[in-house]
A protein has these predicted regions:
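Contiguous ligand/interfacial binding patches
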Residues: 18-44, 48-49, 133-232
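Extracellular beta-rich ligand/substrate-recognition surface
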Residues: 89-101, 173-182
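Solvent-exposed loop and beta-edge segments used for protein-protein assembly and interaction
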Residues: 95-99, 118-120, 191-193
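Residues within well-ordered beta-strands of beta-sheet-rich folds
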Residues: 104-106, 123-129, 198-200
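Extended extracellular/luminal ectodomain segments enriched in beta-structured repeat modules
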Residues: 112-125
Length: 241
């Protein structure tokens, strides 16, 4: 069934209470929206993205912006290159240089997609896999509001920060060719408290690619080791901590 009309018009509201994920991972393996639109404004409702204690929460992924790109599949469900149904895996054709697509991931109470009730969840993770140099060059992901990130100690990615908890992770190693699970070509982002995540995928070059994004915090970074970084936070007096 389709939840298209019911979703229109809801707004993001930051609730004070944060529900800690407490080590629970997210999974995008149960989409409820049939044939979601691949144009700006298209969205998919995902059922039971995370369960904390005895309570499950849903998510809505929405396409906010598209530049120099065509989305061939909102979320590919296959096992190519270590993909799985639990990943959010948009398949994209970059039609011109410097293309990008921005998504929002909004967390809501279970079953409330008809009249979304936002929830604020803490201590959650997104991991972008296989950002190597095979396929469109200079592939990247960007996000905002993250409280920390993890890269491999000899990563193939560069990090450019444009603000506190705002930045881009991009393949910076020409010729790098890794498996889908290689720790050198991935990044994990942590969000300490949020009800909406902004996530951008993109590339400098052109051509097709399927992005692999999981709601996990993997511990195995073979053939490298994890290098974690924490983003300073601003307290009420304007200093950083």
């Amino acid at each position: 069934f389709c939840l298209g009309l019911a979703f229109i018009g809801w707004s993001h509201t930051l609730y004070a209470q944060t529900i800690s994920a407490a080590g629970n991972e997210m999974s995008f393996d149960d989409p409820l929206t049939v044939s979601p639109s691949t144009s700006v404004g298209g969205f998919c409702v995902y059922n039971d993205v995370i369960t904390i204690g005895a309570t499950s929460y849903d998510a809505i992924i929405t396409i906010d912006n598209i530049s120099n790109a065509l989305i061939s599949d909102f979320d590919v469900n296959n096992t190519v290159n270590s993909n799985s149904s639990s990943h959010f895996s948009p398949s994209v054709l970059w039609t011109s240089a410097n293309g990008y697509i921005t998504y929002s991931i909004d967390f809501i109470e279970d079953g409330s997609a008809g009249a979304p009730v936002p929830v604020t969840i803490g201590d959650i993770f997104l991991t972008a896999w296989d950002i190597d140099d095979v396929g469109p060059s200079g592939r990247f992901i960007s996000s905002s509001g993250f409280s920390g990130y993890t890269l491999g100690s000899n990563t193939y990615l560069s990090y450019a920060s444009t603000g506190l908890g705002v930045g881009t992770f991009q393949n910076a190693t020409s010729g790098s060719n890794t498996s889908g699970t290689d720790g050198r070509s991935r990044v994990t982002l942590e969000y300490s408290s949020t009800n909406s995540i902004s996530l951008t995928i993109g590339a400098i070059g052109t051509g097709p690619h399927t992005y692999l994004i999981s709601g996990t915090n993997p511990q195995n970074w073979f053939p490298t080791t994890a290098n974690e970084s924490t983003i300073p936070t601003i307290n009420t007096f304007g200093s950083t901590a």
